[in-house]
Regions:
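Adenine nucleotide-associated cytosolic modules
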Residues: 1-163
Length: 163
């Protein structure tokens, strides 16, 4: 089991100025992203990849959510992940659909478990895997193989530097 550890959280409620956000990411061991705006999600993914910081991504609305663990050098960036899924698979806006709170609890616990595993090195991280949860059908789907894309200026470059 995981021994005693000390974890400090910093909640950033709004998109900070770029320089402030860069320093916050640089000072972090891990970033957990639950933003609503896709451009902010992609900007944060780019920052984490450039800083070589793991990013736990959550996207969703209503009763459909997805989780992705981005590990620089081991998995693709969020931009490449979304491009590989295509627009027909994108999840709508939380503002338009709302969020079922009981499902949000499951998602939050999954993010917390992912964070503990990354920070402690305990268990296997779910990098390269997209976990899709559909609360309406009760289906959970795991898609694998989201490796760094060699010609991507973010995840491809980071992988090249790590090799």
């Amino acid at each position: 089991m995981v021994g005693d550890c000390q974890i400090t959280f910093q909640l950033v409620e709004s998109h900070s100025a770029t320089s402030e956000l860069e320093s916050q990411v640089a000072a972090s061991d891990l970033v957990i992203e639950v933003l609503h705006d896709w451009q902010e999600k992609l900007s944060l993914s780019d920052l984490c990849m450039a800083s070589r910081k793991p990013l736990l991504h959550c996207g969703g609305a209503g009763m459909r959510f997805q989780l992705f663990c981005m590990l620089p050098g081991k998995s693709c960036c969020l931009r490449c992940l979304l491009a590989s899924l295509g627009l027909e698979d994108s999840i709508g806006s939380r503002e338009a659909q709302g969020v079922l709170e009981s499902l949000a609890g499951i998602i939050g616990n999954s993010l917390a478990l992912g964070a503990v595993k990354i920070l402690s090195g305990f268990g296997a991280s779910q990098s390269n895997e997209l976990i899709k949860i559909d609360g309406l059908s009760g289906e959970l789907e795991v898609l694998r193989g989201f490796d760094p894309v060699s010609d991507c200026p973010d995840c491809g470059v980071v992988r090249g530097k790590l090799l």
